[in-house]
Amino acid sequence: MTGFDADDAAALIQSYVDDHGLLSFLGVSVEDASDGEMRLRIPYHEKLTNHGPGEGDVHGGIAATLIDTAGGLAVRSALPKPVAANVATIDLNVSYLRPARGDLIADASVVRVGSTVGVAEISVVTPADTADAEPTEVAVGRGSFRVFRDD
């Protein structure tokens, strides 16, 4: 159980994102947050895309940033005192599955949080084009995060 009410978690994390230079520049929004789970979105914008071959495809570094951020926040949300605690990425793996041309949505789930290290798995999708279509998975990742507890 985390140290804050689940109803307030998304608003609290959104405030953190809004105060973070890079994350606010990217337009990151918190769609869902709970104990050990996180859903973040980055809206599509041409300033975040590749030029030349593949023009219009979201740059892979944007997906990697989203994977890193969602994983770290998911691990932090699983801690007894998530507001007082902190995490730092110690290992990040990203596998790109296909080009992304649209908003990116990351779903992160904690695999395990130990006394000093937490691990999360993250999937990044682009939303479906139509109501009857499925979202398209564009990248997957796994992050290991050093945990700095205050409990």
UniProtKB/Swiss-Prot annotation:
EC number: 3.1.2.-
UniProt xrefs under CDD domains: PaaI_thioesterase (cd03443)
Molecular-function annotations in GO: hydrolase activity
The entry's keywords: Hydrolase
Pfam families documented for this protein: 4HBT
Source organism, top-level taxon: Archaea
SUPFAM superfamilies: Thioesterase/thiol ester dehydrase-isomerase (SSF54637)
Entry's family note: Belongs to the thioesterase PaaI family.
UniProt-recorded name of the protein: Putative esterase VNG_1336C
Source organism per UniProt: Halobacterium salinarum (strain ATCC 700922 / JCM 11081 / NRC-1) (Halobacterium halobium)
